[in-house]
Regions:
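Negatively charged
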Residues: 1-422
Length: 422
């Protein structure tokens, strides 16, 4: 390994089979022209080779490298923040490569991936973080011919690609072996539609957490209607921060019966006015519903949740926090929340909520945190619906009705069972 050197003169006296970390963090290295004479035919590992070479702007010199025996390309150009194009790689035979994770991650100037069009990545199984942190990348059409059928990990692949406005090039990808799609398009703030994903077979996927988190330009979910997510367990943060998302009808056919984590799923979806499409969801295995609709300030109607089986849910904190347009919650009347222990902030900031009809039958006996549950519900005039409750396990009742400015009638609270409170 040559670490942090400014001027490099490479003299090779014997056969090399491993170039791992060779120029690790050589931050002043600007070009690698002299490497054109390097005999790479026996090399098997290129991982971290140019890791952190932040001044490297030109990769001329590697065009004719024989990389046919290399299996590990992970982190190879990670952190090469001055690298704007990779045209010199078009003739590389990467057919033996199985590990491509972080290969071009944090190449913040990379705007063009011409050179990768004809790569044979058919043996690749790990593509995680491959283009993570490439905010200048606006076009991935060059990946259209990639055979990723052996890939199992696609997590963070395009994470932070904030200039990516469409996903043309991925339409025909065979991702049927993929199990991890978490954070795949996280932070793609210019992405406005995902229609090209309708053919994806994600039936083996179990982790979808944060997949489209932080995609504020995404308008609808057309393209996902027929996704088979039946093996999915983690749906947390899936559409978190999708500020422009108007419609989630495309999720109506999703089988989420194995899902256990739905936290933050639609958190911060400011434009979402209804949740039609979720009415047939089987969430019976879900245990975490915290922040699910937090900050959905346009949500005025929760029709679609009436028949949800939330009997395994233990965390409902912040679930509807900040839903300032929500005026009634009648649709929750049949919810079995008997396993719930955290109800804190659940309806905080629901400024338009007029009454609590829908909560009359709720069994809160296992709840221990009720802090701020109705804080800021300034249109609430009474708390009918919460009478005669056994909340003896509760340890936090702080600010339950703080800033409930219109709350005139507190009758019912005197019938709460607080017998174990000190």
């Amino acid at each position: 390994m040559i670490k942090g050197e400014n001027n490099i003169k490479l003299i090779i006296k014997k056969k090399i089979i491993n170039l791992e970390y060779m120029f690790y963090e050589c931050k002043s290295l600007k070009n690698i022209k002299e490497l054109k004479y390097l005999d790479t035919k026996d090399i098997t590992n290129f991982s971290d080779m140019f890791y952190g070479c932040s001044s490297l702007s030109d990769i001329k010199g590697v065009e004719n490298w024989n990389v046919s025996n290399v299996n590990n390309f992970s982190f190879m150009f990670n952190g090469c923040s001055s690298l704007s194009n990779i045209k010199g790689l078009e003739n590389w035979n990467v057919s033996n490569g199985n590990n491509f994770k972080y290969m071009f991650s944090y190449c913040s100037s990379l705007s063009d991936i011409k050179g990768l069009e004809n790569w044979n990545v058919s043996n690749g199984n790990d593509f995680s973080d491959m283009f993570n942190g490439c905010p200048s990348l606006s076009d991935i059409k060059g990946l259209g011919n990639w055979n990723v059928s052996n890939g199992n990990n696609f997590s963070y692949m395009f994470n932070g690609c904030s200039s990516l406005s469409d996903i043309k090039g991925l339409e025909n990808w065979n991702v049927s072996n993929g199990n991890n799609f978490s954070y795949m398009f996280n932070g793609c703030s210019s992405l406005s539609n995902i229609k090209g994903l309708e053919k994806w077979n994600v039936s083996n996927g179990n982790n979808f957490g944060n997949m489209f988190n932080g995609c504020p330009s995404l308008l609808d979910l057309r393209g996902l209607e027929n996704w088979n997510v039946s093996n999915g367990k983690d749906f947390s943060f899936f559409y978190n921060g999708c500020l422009s998302l108007l419609d989630i009808k495309g999720l109506g056919n999703w089988n989420v019966s194995n899902g256990n984590n739905f936290s933050y799923m639609f958190n911060g979806c400011l434009s979402l006015s209804d949740i039609k499409g979720l009415e047939n969801w089987n969430v019976s295995n879900g245990n975490n519903f915290s922040y699910m609709f937090n900050g959905c300030s346009s949500l005025s109607d929760i029709k679609g949740l009436e028949n949800w089986n939330v009997s395994n849910g233990n965390n409902f904190s912040y679930m509807f926090n900040g839903c300032s347009s929500l005026s009634d919650i009648k649709g929750l009347e049949n919810w079995n929340v008997s396993n719930g222990n955290d109800f804190s902030y659940m309806f905080k900031g629901c400024l338009s909520l007029l009454d609590l009809r829908g909560l009359e039958k709720w069994n809160l006996s296992n709840g221990n945190d009720f802090g701020d549950i109705l804080n800021g519900c300034s249109s609430l005039s009474n708390i009918k619906g919460l009478e005669r409750r056994n909340v003896s396990n509760g340890n936090d009742f702080s600010d339950i009705i703080y800033r409930g400015l219109s709350l005139l009638d507190l009758k019912g609270l005197q019938k709460w069972n607080l017998s174990e409170q000190q």
